């Protein structure tokens, strides 16, 4: 059971890495309703849902998930996360982030307030424990960051097809309240997907490389393991009406098999801009 719990913590860390990406900037607005299934070595271990709303002035993203099957028997877990922010010059700027994860009879709560990329307030329950080999989080580490939920939206630069290699060319600074880390993305290939409900079409596949910066315990095996991985992938699909791409599928190796998080529902619809809506009303 202890071994399963250790592997579960590793899977949770891998899921955090896979779920993070970069900020989005939109020319139009859209909404996404998605449902995901998580498997480990081909066995379902979890499921979740994700809702994203992007308007002309702000965005909202919320997700929840639970463990299922054998994983729930040994280490039941569930979690929720949400973020809200404004669009400044088309760029999402984090305002509020909150996350709650409950697993193995323990609950972890995090809330962040962010202004202009700088963390102005953070609340952790339980507080971050003092460990001799924990890399301290400095004030500088709290600047120029994205919260993990805001970081899950990727905007392709330019005016061409957003499903292009350029979507992957970036490095992102992320702070989740306890850990400051970088994710580096690199283009791997184009592929195709088909959800049971919703999107069917091309995706951009990016390689993802995790680099811990601060807040981590250097002796932790999970940190060392994920830092060395070179086989993590994220498959990006579009939110209709925007240049924003978000993860459709995420995968990476673990010591006991491949971890995969994949959408079985990916329903995305464009929302008319205010100018478009006003034009329709006058016709």
Please give the residue ranges for each predicted region.
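Bacterial N-terminal signal peptides that target proteins for export
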Residues: 1-13
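Bacterial N-terminal signal peptides
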Residues: 11-21
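Acidic, serine/threonine-rich low-complexity disordered tracts
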Residues: 26-116, 159-283
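Internal, conserved structured core segments that host functional sites
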Residues: 105-149
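Long, charge-rich C-terminal accessory regions
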Residues: 152, 156-158
């Amino acid at each position: 059971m202890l071994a399963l719990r250790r592997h579960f913590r590793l899977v949770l860390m891998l899921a955090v890495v896979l779920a993070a990406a970069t900020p989005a900037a939109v020319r139009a607005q859209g909404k996404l309703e998605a449902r995901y299934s998580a498997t480990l070595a081909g066995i379902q271990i979890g499921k979740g849902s994700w809702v994203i709303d992007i308007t002309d002035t702000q965005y909202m993203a919320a997700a929840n998930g639970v463990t299922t099957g054998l994983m729930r028997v040994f280490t039941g877990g569930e979690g929720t996360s949400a973020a809200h922010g404004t669009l400044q010059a088309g760029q999402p700027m984090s305002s509020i982030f909150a996350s709650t994860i409950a697993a193995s009879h323990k609950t972890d709560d995090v809330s962040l307030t962010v202004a202009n990329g700088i963390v102005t307030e953070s609340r952790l329950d339980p507080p971050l424990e003092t460990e001799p080999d924990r890399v301290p989080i400095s004030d500088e580490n709290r600047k120029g960051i994205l919260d993990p939920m805001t970081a899950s939206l990727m905007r392709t630069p330019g005016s061409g097809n957003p499903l292009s290699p350029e979507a992957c060319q970036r490095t992102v600074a992320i702070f989740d309240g306890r850990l400051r880390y970088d994710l580096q993305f690199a283009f791997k290939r184009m592929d195709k997907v088909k959800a049971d409900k919703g999107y069917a079409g091309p995706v951009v596949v990016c390689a993802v490389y995790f680099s811990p910066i601060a807040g981590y315990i250097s002796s932790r095996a999970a940190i060392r393991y994920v830092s060395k991985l070179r086989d993590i992938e994220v498959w990006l699909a579009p939110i209709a009406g925007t240049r924003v791409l978000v993860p459709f599928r995420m995968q990476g190796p673990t010591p006991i098999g491949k971890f995969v998080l994949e959408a079985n529902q990916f329903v995305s619809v464009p929302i008319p801009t205010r100018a478009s809506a006003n034009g329709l009303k006058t016709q």
